[in-house]
Amino acid sequence: MKKIILTVFAATSLLLYSTPSFALFSVSVGIPMSQTITGKKSGQTYGNAPDKTSGYFLAVQLPFALGFGIDSYTTKFKTGESDGAWDKDMDTGLKTNMTNIFYQLPVPVVNLIIGLGMGTTEYDCKTRDGKGCSAYYDKGSATQWYTSIGMPLIPLFDIHLSYRSITAKNIKDKENGTKDDNSGSVTGIGIAFNF
């Protein structure tokens, strides 16, 4: 009897695990793990030096594999005397807000998502005059493409890794009109709940 129960359990697990994990409705939440900036600051041979990233990714997938999401996160810059570092007193970071549309590809076993997004980037800092970075820099527009791969742990829950490639070349210095290129990439991790 134990062998039959074990065999049925194993067969059911394999069957459920190997079927596509499309859901009628899915909610996903994630966090950024790291950001790299490959673009250059205006007039420099280097870009801003990212340090710690915090924020969130939220997404809702509809029954026909199409979904919508938002990203909101801030990456603090390194401080000190190295290239790309900012003054410690300014506590400067790059604030990113994106709105996304994505599609889940019909791939068995894993949840594979591709998407596009658009939004803004801006410097977030403290200044000695108390006005903050918005008094000295204009917000810039940003676009991204991204992909996410998720592995279902149980039929109603999966864990996923994501990669975002961001183009953000136009945070403008209000004083001299130069633009900073903060293009780069962001990696993240998240969980999805399927209903």
Task: Tell what function each PLM region has.
Residues 31, 35, 56-131, 138-141, ...:
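Gram-negative (and chloroplast) outer-membrane scaffold detector with strong preference
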Residues 23-39:
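Short N-terminal segments immediately surrounding and downstream of signal-peptide cleavage
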Residues 34-56, 135-139, 169-171, 181:
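Surface-exposed strand-loop-strand hairpins of Gram-negative outer-membrane beta-barrel proteins
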Residues 40-43, 84-86, 129-133, 174:
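Extracytoplasmic loops and strand-loop junctions of Gram-negative outer membrane beta-barrel proteins
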Residues 156-195:
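Hydrophobic secondary-structure block in the mid-to-C-terminal portion of proteins
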Residues 11-12:
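Repetitive helical segments and hydrophobic/amphipathic motifs
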Residues 1-8:
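Bacterial N-terminal signal peptides that target proteins for export
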